[in-house]
Structures are given as C-alpha cells and as structure tokens.
A protein has these predicted regions:
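Gly/Ser/Thr-rich loops at beta-strand to alpha-helix junctions
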Residues: 1-5
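Conserved phosphate- and dinucleotide-binding cores of soluble alpha/beta proteins
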Residues: 18, 24-155
Length: 155
C-alpha cells in the first residue's frame, strides 16, 4: 500500500475536510466517509490508478490548497524528491505551487537515497514527516534546509 493510502486509513473519524486526489484508490477509500468531500482529478490514468497528465495539471492550476501531502520514491537533501519515471514531475510541481504548505510523507526506507529523476529540491517542502528509525544525520540535513522535521513515535 502507498504511504498516501495508509494516511487515508488513519484519518481521525470526526475530521471534516475536502480532499483533492489524482488517485482512484485513495478517492475510493475516502468516499466511504460522510465527513470527507472528495474531488477526483481527471485525465489519463496509469496502471496504478493515478492521473498525472495535462488534464490533471490544468485542473490543479485552477485550485488552491491549504496543505498538500506528497510522497515519491525517495528524498535526499542533495537531490530532493525523486522518482523513477518523469511523467509526474510537472504534476507534483503544480501541486506544490498551488499549496500554502507542502508536507512530505517519507518513511525511513525512502530517506537519504536518490532515484533517477528529481522532481524538485527538498526545500520546496515546508514539513517532512517520517518515522522513528530515520537517521539523525539525514534529518539534520533537512533541518539545515529550513524544513520542519516531524518524527512519528513508534506505537
């Protein structure tokens, strides 16, 4: 399961929010909650149920978000957010550009390594949320870039 999907399963039961997503899987999970309004972005869907194309990007450019939550294959202080395929670069940059606050969700295994293609520098994130196993050295590098680092406790 994706990090975003796991986040949807752990939202407080009484939260009242509107969510914009490019993922049919996440939209399907969220639509089960009466207190969550879902806007599903359109466009050509990939085999994982996500839309990253020009239609989705143009829709994103017409919206404004208080917060965006994103993840990618990897993140490092030097190479930034990175992925294996370049199709999503413009989409994720449009999401960040349309957001007041960009929050990265990165478990330990995605931190401090680089994938093939950089989406953007790490300091485009305002906040990085990770788990208790993340390397202090890696986290200090993000802190030095001015990124607020939040460590989720082990439970």
């Amino acid at each position: 399961a994706s990090v975003g999907y796991l986040m949807t399963q752990n939202l407080p039961a009484d939260i009242k929010i509107r969510v914009v997503t490019n993922s049919i899987v996440i939209a399907e999970e969220l639509r089960k909650n009466d207190n969550i309004s879902v806007i599903m972005l359109g466009g050509e869907m990939d085999n994982k149920g996500n839309c990253y194309d020009a239609i989705a990007i143009e829709t994103i450019k017409r919206l404004r978000f208080d917060k965006c939550f994103l993840t990618s294959a990897c993140i490092s202080a030097s190479f930034g957010l990175s992925i294996q395929k370049s199709q999503a670069i413009s989409f994720w940059n449009a999401v960040i550009d349309s957001s007041k606050q960009a929050i990265g969700l990165y478990p330990t295994e995605k931190i401090g390594i680089d994938s093939i293609v950089s989406i953007c520098p790490a300091n485009r994130l305002n906040t990085l949320i990770t788990d208790w196993d993340a390397s202090e050295e890696d986290l200090c590098q993000f802190d030095d870039l001015g990124i607020e680092v939040v460590i989720v406790d082990k439970e």
